[in-house]
Design a protein with these regions (language model features):
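ACP-dependent fatty acid/polyketide chain-elongation machinery
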Residues: 2-75, 97
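Structured loops at beta-to-helix junctions and adjacent beta-edge loops in soluble globular domains
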Residues: 19, 114-116
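Acyl-thioester C-C bond-transforming condensing/cleaving domain
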Residues: 2-11, 27, 37-43, 95-107, ...
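Basic side chains
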Residues: 13, 74-77, 81, 108, ...
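A glycine- and small-residue-enriched flexible loop/hinge segment at structural boundaries
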Residues: 48-99, 121, 148-162
């Protein structure tokens, strides 16, 4: 980008054209929004694991495990839960925006995904395997499961987003920052389309214990 001395580059208008969500309230942005408007709560008893003697046994837990028809079945087996949430939400947003992959320049489309915990649960699970059965039982695919950047990678790979791509990790602000950074990328003219948001899976024993310990 170039600009003459004393002038500023024109700022492009940026608009949101599609929204997706997978929440404790519902699978889908519209259903989640309607239930929120109706005063329903996404907080419920933890079901995916037994909290035992934990003093807190409720959480905002996503009950479902999204299927991943957008990626290879073998690859899907090694996608961390948080990344599954991100893929499902991204797919809904792309569909809601009416984006046809044949109709846009893939080098001008990118993604920004925020996550705080990333695939931490995958680390916990593989550590158990390592402790119980030794190094020989550690999956060679482990290194493609837990990293924070894998969620953003899977979205870019599934929907052929070959433009700017990044992973943001700034705790509870990460989703807002990812959307803000994507906004800036478009406004600066570095991309025409950005898929941006936040994906998190934090309702597992170690993470919950860290908040109540």
């Amino acid at each position: 980008m170039t600009m003459e001395s004393g002038t500023r580059p024109a700022r492009r208008r940026v608009v949101v054209t599609g929204v997706g969500a997978l929440t404790p309230l519902a699978n889908g942005a519209e259903a989640s929004w309607q239930r929120a408007l109706a005063g329903e709560s996404g907080i419920s008893w933890i079901e995916r694991w037994d909290p035992g003697d934990f003093p807190v046994r409720i959480a905002g837990e996503v009950k479902t495990t999204p299927e991943l028809p957008w990626i290879d079945a073998k690859a899907a087996r090694n996608v961390a839960r948080y990344a599954r949430f991100g893929l499902a939400a991204a797919a809904e947003a792309i569909e809601a925006a009416g984006l046809d992959q044949a109709d846009f320049d893939h080098t001008r489309a990118g993604g920004m995904l925020g996550t705080g915990a990333g695939g931490m649960e995958s680390i916990v699970e593989m550590t158990r395997t390592f402790d119980a059965r030794g190094y020989g039982r550690v999956s060679p695919f482990f290194m493609t499961t837990f990293p924070h950047n894998m969620g953003s990678y899977h979205i870019a790979q599934a929907f052929q987003l070959h433009g700017p791509n990044a992973t943001i990790s700034t705790a509870c602000a990460t989703g807002a920052q990812a959307i803000g950074d994507a906004f800036d990328v478009i406004r600066r003219g570095q991309a025409d389309i950005m898929v941006a948001g936040w994906a998190e899976h934090a309702v597992f024993p170690l993470f919950v214990a860290s908040f109540i310990g």
